[in-house]
Structure formats: structure tokens, C-alpha cells
């Protein structure tokens, strides 16, 4: 666990405990490293690995390599990078704590490490994310929020006066 950017209400110990719970819930085998950093660092990672020159809230990097210094058979499942800056903005906009937002982003990244891909799986990751965030007692997760933002807003019809 690396907290490069300190965030009020978020401790390494608390995040480590949540990562273990989320890893088990998502069925991820192996160790997961989580980096909480600033938007500039996440933008650099996004540009370097995905050719997207912009900051984003969370990135996941699956790995099948043995963890450094580990016993044979111990694998590094992958790494998750979270923008603390975007987490703070999201939490303020959505009315929940930054700690909850970082947990939501961690869960989303964990599901990517488990092999889910919301861009290609016809809603499978969205259903799993909703189920797990409810079990982990978290506010609405990323895919749910994106779905709500894309839903067409139906205007109520005006009644005609007779």
C-alpha cells in the first residue's frame, strides 16, 4: 500500500484491510498493490500505458509475475493506481466520504484485476460491482454512476386543461 498523497480520513491500515476484503470478494488470487497518488502521476501512467493523455480516477494493471521476494507460487495479482485528487472531487460532488470513494475505486480496480471489462462484457462487471459494493456497504459504484448519467431524462408531460 502506498499513500503518496495523504487524504483526510484515509489510513494505510484501513485501506489494507479493505483491499483484503475486496480481493476476497472479487475472487482475486495473489497480492494487490494500491497506489494513492495525485492526478499528475495518474495522468502520466494513463498516457504511458493506455495512450490517453488525461488524468482518470483509477487504473488497473494485471500481472502474472511472481511477487518480488516472495515464495514460489506466490503471485502478484496486479496493481491499482488511484487519483486522490479525483477521489476528493467525486466524494464532494456525490456527498460521501473520501475514504468511501477510494474504496469504490479500489473495488472497481479489483474487478478489472479479476478479469472483468465493463467496456466489453455486456453488463457482467456492472452487476458484479453492484453486488459487491452492496455486500461491502459502499455507496453507488462507478459503473452504476456512469449508467445513471447516461440514462435519458424523461420530462413529465404537461396536462391539458379542459
Q: Where are the predicted features?
A:
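Conserved SAM/SAH cofactor-binding pocket of Class I
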Residues: 104-105
Amino acid at each position: 500500500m502506498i499513500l503518496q498523497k495523504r487524504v483526510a480520513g484515509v489510513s494505510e491500515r484501513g485501506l489494507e484491510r479493505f483491499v483484503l476484503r475486496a480481493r476476497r470478494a472479487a475472487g482475486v488470487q495473489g497480492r494487490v498493490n494500491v497506489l494513492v497518488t495525485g492526478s499528475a502521476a495518474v495522468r502520466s501512467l494513463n498516457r504511458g500505458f493506455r495512450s490517453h493523455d488525461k488524468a482518470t480516477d483509477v487504473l488497473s494493471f494485471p500481472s502474472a509475475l511472481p511477487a518480488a521476494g516472495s515464495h514460489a507460487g506466490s503471485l502478484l495479482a496486479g496493481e491499482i493506481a488511484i487519483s486522490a485528487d479525483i477521489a476528493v472531487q467525486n466524494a464532494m460532488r456525490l456527498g460521501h466520504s473520501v475514504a468511501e470513494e477510494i474504496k469504490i475505486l479500489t473495488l472497481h480496480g479489483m474487478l478489472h484485476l479479476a478479469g472483468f471489462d465493463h467496456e466489453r462484457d455486456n453488463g457482467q462487471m456492472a452487476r458484479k460491482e453492484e453486488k459487491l459494493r452492496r455486500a461491502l456497504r459502499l455507496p453507488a459504484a462507478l459503473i452504476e454512476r456512469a449508467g445513471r448519467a447516461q440514462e435519458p431524462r424523461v420530462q413529465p408531460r404537461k396536462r391539458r386543461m379542459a
